[in-house]
């Protein structure tokens, strides 16, 4: 009886197939909304949060785009990955850094959107996810208090892995990296870390604690690499010493996150580059305003290749 039913169903399916199948017509439509988190400042570094949609002009690979999404002081929920360097080089400074991180997380989760969440990572020669995304400050703070310094610095691995997790989440993606310098033990390299962050639409805010102001005692190469990572994602690098300057850096990050514009467009007519990377440029009227946003994004084919492991 079952075989008879299957046979009748198969016959019905075959009957629905034309005797001479027509060639398929493939229509490709780009429906991806490209979102940009934008910070605007004046020449004194003051945040400007009063601009309107018509004040912004966007170019994708040199082609002007139509703005389809605009939010001033966006309340899109934040997913914030906090990466703490616990390598041996952090030494006695680590406890001061952790105190400032704790204050930052308390303020972040206590203010703003009640859907904001944080995740906590530590990294030395390996990367450890200490707390997945949560709103429970006590849970994250407890993990912070247990951190100790030892080992090397897998900075790029930490950025790469945290970006992969952020890519799966809704809302705004932010990564705050507390470190004292450059990478020493990662499997991933600088370019892989940057690409992962850009694919995840993640703003990088490296906080490079530099108790030594003389270049001779600092990892200037590591600082330059993180400055480039921040600029490529639309974030900003901070170089505080300990104490009040470190607390001020975290306060500045919070202010920027609360004053961001969210601008989006559906790409049209933008020529593709060989690596599928689209360069973005966004401008606002007036010579005294500076726009901070990510340098670009990867096209769909690049994302598909990455996700399939090719």
Task: Give a label for each model feature.
Residues 19-310:
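Scaffold/interface architecture of coatomer-like assemblies
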Residues 5-16:
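Bacterial N-terminal signal peptides
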Residues 1-2:
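N-terminal secretory signal peptides that target proteins for export/translocation
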């Amino acid at each position: 009886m079952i075989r008879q039913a299957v046979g009748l169903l198969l016959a019905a399916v075959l009957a629905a197939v034309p005797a001479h199948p027509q060639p398929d017509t493939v229509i490709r439509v780009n429906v991806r909304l490209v979102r940009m988190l934008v910070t605007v400042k004046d020449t004194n570094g003051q945040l400007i949060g009063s601009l309107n949609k018509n004040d912004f002009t966007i170019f994708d690979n040199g082609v002007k785009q139509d703005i389809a999404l605009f939010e001033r002081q966006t309340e899109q929920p934040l997913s914030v990955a906090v990466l703490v360097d616990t390598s041996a080089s952090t030494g006695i400074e680590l406890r001061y850094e952790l105190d400032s991180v704790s204050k930052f997380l308390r303020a972040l989760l206590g203010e703003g959107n009640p859907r904001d969440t944080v995740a906590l990572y530590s990294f030395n020669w390996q990367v450890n996810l200490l707390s997945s995304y949560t709103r429970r400050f006590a849970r994250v703070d407890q993990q912070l208090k247990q951190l100790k310094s030892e080992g090397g610095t897998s900075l790029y691995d930490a950025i790469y892995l945290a970006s992969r997790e952020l890519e799966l989440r809704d809302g705004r993606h932010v990564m705050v990296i507390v470190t004292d310098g450059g990478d020493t033990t990662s499997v991933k390299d600088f370019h892989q870390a940057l690409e992962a962050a850009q694919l995840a639409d993640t703003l990088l805010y490296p906080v490079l604690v530099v108790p030594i102001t003389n270049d001779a005692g600092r990892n200037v190469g590591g600082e330059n690499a993180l400055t480039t990572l921040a600029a490529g994602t639309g974030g900003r690098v901070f170089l505080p010493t300990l104490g009040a300057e470190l607390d001020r850096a975290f306060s500045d990050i919070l202010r920027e996150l609360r004053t961001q514009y969210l601008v989006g467009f559906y790409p049209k007519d933008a020529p593709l580059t060989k690596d599928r990377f689209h360069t973005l440029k966004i401008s606002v009227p007036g010579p005294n305003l500076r726009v901070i946003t990510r340098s670009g994004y990867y096209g769909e084919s690049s994302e598909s290749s990455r996700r399939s492991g090719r």
